[in-house]
Amino acid sequence: MAVSALQLWRMGGLLRRRFPTCLSPWKIPPRVLKSSQPEALVSLTNNAVAFAPLQTLTDEEIMMKQTVKKFAQEHVAPLVSSMDENSKMEKSVIQGLFQQGLMGIEVEAQYGGTEASFFCSVLVIEELAKVDASVALLCDIQNTIINNLFRKHASEEQKATYLPKLVTEKLGSFCLSEAGAGSDSFAMKTRADKSGNYYVLNGSKMWISHAEHAELFLVFANVDPSSGYRGITCFLVDRDTEGFQIGKRENKMGIRASSTCQLTFENVKVPETNILGKIGHGYKYAIGSLNEGRIGIAAQMLGLAQGCFDYTIPYIKERMQFGKRIFDFQGLQHQVAQVATQLEATRLLTYNAARLVEAGRPFIKEASMAKYYASEVAGLTTSKCIEWMGGVGYTKDYPVEKFFRDAKIGTIYEGASNIQLNTIAKHIDAEY
């Protein structure tokens, strides 16, 4: 098994037309916004409390960020266009994520994990999304939802059985949504009826991410529909379980390399030992994991938007029209300044929410704010970048239009934008 870079550190296409030289099809942008680059945390010489800027990172966080950036540029970027076109995640990318230790970021070392921080997960997701949002989502769900559900709610036996595989080779899938239970996720109809030492699952799930490659499915089903959401329980279902079927992948607009499938359960027998946590507590686990997961999606949208912005700015600084750079037109400068400001605000919202999680402080409102705002800014940023690049940005020869397509999902999954606004308003009402 390959050792992650962080663990080692701890131990010791031709252009069809003539365009500015900075523009190269499906390549990593040569320049990035300086203000988006973090600085290492400096040691204070006095006893004062350190109130460091939110973008100030520890040496470990800097190392993680640099490692992921290198991995994304060298191993993901060359495959992004083909994965999008073929709607398929390359196995080499999945294997690379495991080999780099990026699929067990917070998992304890005793289970083979990297044992880093939640904030490190956010940095990893952001860096991957600068290159491909689909790969970032793969890493996001595995870390912020699947692994953390096990870390917080699994029995010691379940942790010992599943976590070592989840951090090295096995993908997990979070199965909550149904055809009639999207934003109202607790209106689910999937049932789990007791039968001896087993529960028998019947029903279906929709819009399930990574179902095509996942080997372990965390399925939420109701053991007592008469109790409403208080009967919802989380079951561990292996891919090869009899009666469990995975449907065809959806032909999506964006994040096409990330599979999304329907699941069907026909008298699927699951042993009692495969219940995650307590019976009837599934709704608590789902809410808790999604609250943290929304910060991951905020990081994905932030990285996606920043990656698109970084790709576009060098072009408009070299593209000449009317005898001068198009960047020199004041109208365009104002648009660029507005987008850059919104990106910075997104980064601060996202980082702040992540730091709140690490500090053990309330973060639900801030997570919703980060997810909502990051999704809106990603849509605006990618749209503007296409406009700034003109016809070039509208073609599939360059990644800007893909960033635009990928961005739209941010306002939909893991809590639509209106749901985030509801959550924010609910907290404001309580605070006043």
Swiss-Prot record:
Family from the record: Belongs to the acyl-CoA dehydrogenase family.
N6-acetyllysine carried by residues: K70, K284, K426
Residues bearing PTM Phosphoserine: S183
Cofactor(s) demanded: FAD
Residues the record lists as N6-succinyllysine modifications: K70, K278, K284
GO cellular component: a single term: mitochondrial matrix
Gene: Acadsb
Pfam families per UniProt: Acyl-CoA_dh_1, Acyl-CoA_dh_M, Acyl-CoA_dh_N
Organelle transit peptide residues: 1-33
InterPro entries given in the database record: Acyl-CoA_DH_CS, Acyl-CoA_Oxase/DH_mid-dom, Acyl-CoA_Oxase/DH_mid-dom_sf, AcylCo_DH-like_C, AcylCo_DH/oxidase_C, AcylCoA_DH/ox_N, AcylCoA_DH/ox_N_sf, AcylCoA_DH/oxidase_NM_dom_sf
Main location: mitochondrion
Protein name listed in UniProt: Short/branched chain specific acyl-CoA dehydrogenase, mitochondrial
Binding site for FAD: 174-183, 207-209, 319, 330, 387-391, 416-418
UniProt keyword Acetylation, yes or no: yes
Enzyme Commission identifier(s): 1.3.8.5
Reaction(s) catalysed (UniProt annotation): 2-methylbutanoyl-CoA + oxidized [electron-transfer flavoprotein] + H(+) = (2E)-2-methylbut-2-enoyl-CoA + reduced [electron-transfer flavoprotein]; (2S)-2-methylbutanoyl-CoA + oxidized [electron-transfer flavoprotein] + H(+) = (2E)-2-methylbut-2-enoyl-CoA + reduced [electron-transfer flavoprotein]; (2R)-2-methylbutanoyl-CoA + oxidized [electron-transfer flavoprotein] + H(+) = ethylacryloyl-CoA + reduced [electron-transfer flavoprotein]; butanoyl-CoA + oxidized [electron-transfer flavoprotein] + H(+) = (2E)-butenoyl-CoA + reduced [electron-transfer flavoprotein]
Pathway the protein takes part in: Lipid metabolism; mitochondrial fatty acid beta-oxidation; Amino-acid degradation; L-isoleucine degradation
GO function terms (MF aspect): flavin adenine dinucleotide binding; identical protein binding; short-chain 2-methyl fatty acyl-CoA dehydrogenase activity; short-chain fatty acyl-CoA dehydrogenase activity
Residue sites binding substrate per the record: S183, Y229, Y283, N291, E292, G293, R294
Taxonomic classification: Eukaryota, Metazoa, Chordata, Craniata, Vertebrata
Self-association and partners: Homotetramer.
Species name: Mus musculus (Mouse)
Locations listed in the record: Mitochondrion matrix
